[in-house]
């Protein structure tokens, strides 16, 4: 080949290599750089490098371990292969090709088995790399202080160590089986070659294979040991209880121990036979015993016979300790061990509930449904098509010196609602960059428009109650936000004012600098949008704001946290903030009942698994709606998982005491967690063993009824004095009914205010006492002739009767049932009208335009009828 052709070839190859490098850099380097800038802009640059370094360290360490496993074995094998030089073999001999391979393997440690070991180590260990964070948790796992009753191991072993051991075992077993198979083949070929010259395989080769065999046996013995520990996750006794029972601990466990013993014997006598040609019969006996023990362990008939003829006739007494272990573990795993059980003794004299205290409580009753509130907000407070209210939430604020329960929603930007002709790049990314303000109304029935009292309304926000928010701009929220470039030469639309628009320039901390051509190039490639690079509307203070959906924002920062489905808005004098509840969860808590999140339609989205058996609301996250800053606060310091993460990432999670007071005043117990806990407590409140075994006091969620359908009643917030008498607390409340029946069995309460945040109380009714549930009250309402006639009359017109969520409200030792009645126009999107309020004590039913009128009417009826005694 001529010189110029050679140079041309080298140049061409160089260009190809450079192109491939740039392509890889484009796919990997640009996202890495963008992430680095994004994390750094939020003061999480050190945290970003921490995570990157941790991944690199785990990658290197795991790779080194498996590299050494392969490298050392290949290096040892190289000393026993290639005893003949290829030159000593006549050309064309059949074994010539094998000797070439073996000779290169023997003499080429750097060029043959070094890269081979590296490639194999990465392939085998790749699942371990993907679990790099689990490795870190394993290394820093705290002592939980609770022991598993089956084996006496700390619970932290099961949460952190056991899953990693299972994964490591699998990869080690694959590695040594691969080595054993490949080197056995090589040594067998070498032995055949040597035997043609009357030679034998070196003793060292036999010992090498023996060590590999021994390692495989030891790994298998470890596997059996982990299977022994894994019995604590048995679901064989569901639906009665979780964890091991008599069959597992008295039948399966002994066979596991026998299998381990026989496997150890097989390993010993196999090595003895290989090296001494002795012990073959004993080896055969141990092998047969191992097969028998393994078969007996998995022989379903043996398990069935034990269960059917030993356990079943004496199940309660035999399974007693295992059931008790399961009850305790399940209550601990879902943080239900400290639920306070109180008896709810109802008053017999109903007329005693008509007093000033009850009247004050009724003013805070949330008669508006969340879904219907959303319709009202969109109709009355959206004001422009490009605004929207993605969700409304319930909270409490001090208004006129009293704790007032309210609805509030953020007026967020909804760019998709702009006319199609206005959906231009400049409008999308430079002009319409943010939402503005909020609306707040009373949760109870009001006197204003749509039967609501508005505490904050309009654009800009107006308030007769003195609410003043310095920065109402919403650049980060629950909506689907595009990237925005702000500030910019074009200026940003802030809010409409009459026939004009008020403009603004973003002054917040959020966003990544977009002042240089290099930065514009990087982001134009990242977003695949050339207009970022070519726009002339940026200047030295311009920044690009992205990942503005708060859930996406948090998941990018802390993907290991499980997020609640409903972040909620908090308004302070400084600005608007989002509070996002976050959970740590696991499927590895021993003996605890497993909850299928998807099967029960619970709203927390599981990551990687549809099941959990441990959960804690360990962290509350605050996101500034204007600046986009994200702060993490620990609200359950007893959780070992969040303790471990705090050790891995020091400084990331702050103690709850550091949360600003004006934000901390609005924390609340999360509905998602409460619903999950109560789904478990419905069964596991039966701590009496006989009652639990008979399942005679199983609870379930009550149903809510419309005139056309029924769905599960979700928890709702009330402001009552159910924790401490004469002290109003913001509570999460859920009535539970008897499974298979409609009567109410208990009322479950979770505190949201300090010092009772997280306090769980179960108010139970005596078993022999009939307390109506929502279905029975719904039947009582439908049977009332006046109510039924009025419903029929309304439905004959163009209107449609919609029943809101029934509020079951315990006040002054009496149960009141409050049923809002709404009217909507059929096939119309007009504002739903709160037409009537129905109130009942379980026997009498009254329906009036307002709650207070209905309350007065109920009083009148009870006094007229002389109704004293126990309500039904």
Swiss-Prot record:
Disulfide bonds: none annotated. Belongs to the UPF0182 family. Keywords: Cell membrane, Membrane, Transmembrane, Transmembrane helix. The lineage of its organism: Bacteria, Pseudomonadati, Pseudomonadota, Gammaproteobacteria, Chromatiales. The chain crosses the membrane at residues 8-28, 56-76, 109-129, 159-179, 207-227, 254-274, 282-302. This is UPF0182 protein Noc_0961. It is found in: Cell membrane. The keyword Transmembrane helix applies. Its main location: membrane. The keyword Transmembrane applies. It is a multi-pass membrane protein. One of its GO terms (cellular component) is extracellular region.
């Amino acid at each position: 080949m001529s010189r110029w052709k050679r140079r041309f070839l080298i140049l061409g190859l160089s260009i190809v290599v450079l192109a491939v490098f740039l392509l890889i850099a484009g796919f990997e380097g640009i996202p890495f750089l963008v992430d680095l800038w994004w994390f750094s802009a939020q003061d999480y640059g050190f945290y970003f490098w921490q995570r990157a370094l941790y991944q690199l360290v785990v990658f290197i360490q795991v790779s080194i371990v498996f590299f050494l496993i392969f490298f050392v074995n290949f290096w040892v094998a190289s000393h026993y292969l290639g005893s003949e030089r290829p030159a000593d073999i006549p050309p064309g001999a059949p074994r010539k090709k094998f000797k070439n391979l073996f000779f290169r393997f023997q003499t080429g440690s750097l060029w043959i088995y070094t890269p081979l070991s590296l490639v194999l180590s990465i392939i085998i260990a790749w699942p371990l790399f993907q679990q790099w964070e689990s490795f870190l948790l394993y290394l820093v796992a705290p002592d939980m202080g609770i022991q598993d009753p089956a084996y006496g191991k700390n619970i932290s072993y099961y949460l952190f160590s056991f899953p990693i051991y299972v994964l490591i075992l699998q990869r080690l077993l694959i590695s040594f089986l691969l080595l054993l198979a490949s080197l056995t083949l090589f040594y067998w070929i070498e032995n055949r070659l040597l035997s043609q010259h009357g030679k034998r395989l070196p003793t060292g080769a036999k010992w090498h294979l023996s060590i590999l065999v021994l390692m495989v046996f030891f790994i298998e013995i470890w596997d059996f040991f982990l299977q022994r520990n894994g019995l604590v996750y048995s679901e064989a006794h569901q639906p009665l209880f979780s964890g091991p029972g008599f069959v597992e601990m008295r039948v399966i466990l002994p066979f596991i121990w026998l299998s381990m013993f026989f496997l150890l014997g097989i390993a010993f006598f196999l090595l003895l036979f290989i090296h001494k040609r002795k012990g073959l019969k004993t080896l055969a006996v141990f092998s047969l015993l191992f097969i028998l023990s393994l078969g007996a362990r998995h022989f379903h008939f043996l398990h069935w016979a034990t269960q059917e003829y030993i356990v079943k006739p004496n199940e309660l007494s035999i399974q007693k300790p295992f059931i008790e272990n399961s009850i305790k573990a399940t209550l601990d795993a879902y943080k239900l061990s400290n639920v306070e059980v109180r008896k709810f003794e109802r008053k017999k004299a109903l007329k005693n509930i008509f007093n000033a205290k009850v009247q004050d409580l009724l003013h805070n009753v949330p008669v508006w449904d969340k879904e219907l509130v959303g319709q009202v907000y969109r109709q009355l407070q959206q004001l422009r098509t490009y605004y929207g209210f993605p969700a409304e939430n319930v909270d409490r604020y001090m208004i006129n010196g009293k704790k007032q329960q309210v609805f509030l929603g953020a007026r967020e930007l909804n760019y998709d609602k702009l006319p199609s002709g206005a959906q231009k790049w400049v409008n999308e990314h430079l002009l319409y960059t943010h939402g503005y303000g909020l609306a707040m109304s009373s949760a109870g029935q009001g006197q204003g428009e749509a039967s609501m009292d508005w505490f904050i309304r309009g654009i800009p926000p107006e308030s007769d109650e003195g609410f003043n928010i310095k920065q109402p701009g919403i650049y980060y929220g629950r909506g689907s936000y595009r990237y925005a470039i702000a500030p910019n030469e074009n200026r940003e639309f802030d809010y409409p004012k009459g026939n004009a628009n008020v403009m603004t320039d973003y002054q917040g901390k959020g966003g990544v600098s977009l002042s240089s051509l290099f930065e514009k190039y990087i982001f134009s490639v990242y977003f695949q949008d050339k207009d970022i690079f070519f726009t002339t509307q940026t200047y030295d203070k311009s920044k690009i704001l992205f990942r503005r959906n708060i859930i996406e924002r948090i998941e990018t920062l802390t993907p290991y946290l499980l997020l609640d489905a409903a972040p909620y808005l908090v308004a302070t004098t400084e600005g608007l903030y989002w509070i996002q509840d976050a959970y740590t969860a696991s499927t590895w808590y021993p003996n605890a009942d497993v909850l299928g999140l998807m099967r029960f339609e619970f709203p927390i989205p599981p990551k990687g698994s549809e099941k959990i058996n441990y959960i804690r609301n360990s962290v509350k996250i605050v996101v500034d709606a204007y600046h986009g800053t994200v702060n993490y606060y620990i609200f359950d310091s007893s959780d070992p998982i969040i303790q471990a993460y705090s050790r891995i990432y020091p400084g990331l999670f702050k103690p709850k005491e550091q949360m600003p007071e004006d934000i901390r005043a609005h924390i609340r117990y999360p509905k998602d967690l409460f619903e999950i806990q109560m789904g478990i407590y419905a069964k596991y409140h039966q701590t009496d063993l006989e009652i639990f075994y008979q399942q005679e006091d199983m609870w379930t969620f009550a149903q809510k009824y419309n005139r056309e359908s029924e769905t599960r009643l979700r928890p709702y917030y009330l402001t009552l004095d159910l924790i401490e008498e004469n002290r109003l607390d913001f509570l999460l409340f859920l009535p539970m009914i008897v499974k298979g029946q409609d009567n109410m069995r208990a009322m479950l309460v979770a505190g949201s205010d300090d010092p009772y945040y997280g306090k769980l109380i179960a108010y139970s009714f005596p078993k022999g006492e009939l307390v109506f549930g929502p279905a029975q009250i719904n039947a009582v309402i439908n049977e009332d002739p006046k109510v039924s006639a009025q419903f029929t009359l309304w439905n004959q017109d163009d209107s449609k009767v919609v029943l809101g969520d029934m509020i079951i409200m315990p006040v002054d030792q009496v149960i009141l049932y409050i049923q809002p009645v709404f009217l909507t126009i059929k096939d119309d999107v007009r504002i739903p009208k709160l037409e009537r309020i129905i109130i009942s004590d379980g026997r009498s039913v009254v329906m009036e335009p307002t709650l207070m009128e209905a309350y007065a009417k109920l009083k009148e009826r009870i006094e007229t009828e002389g109704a004293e005694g126990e309500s039904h």
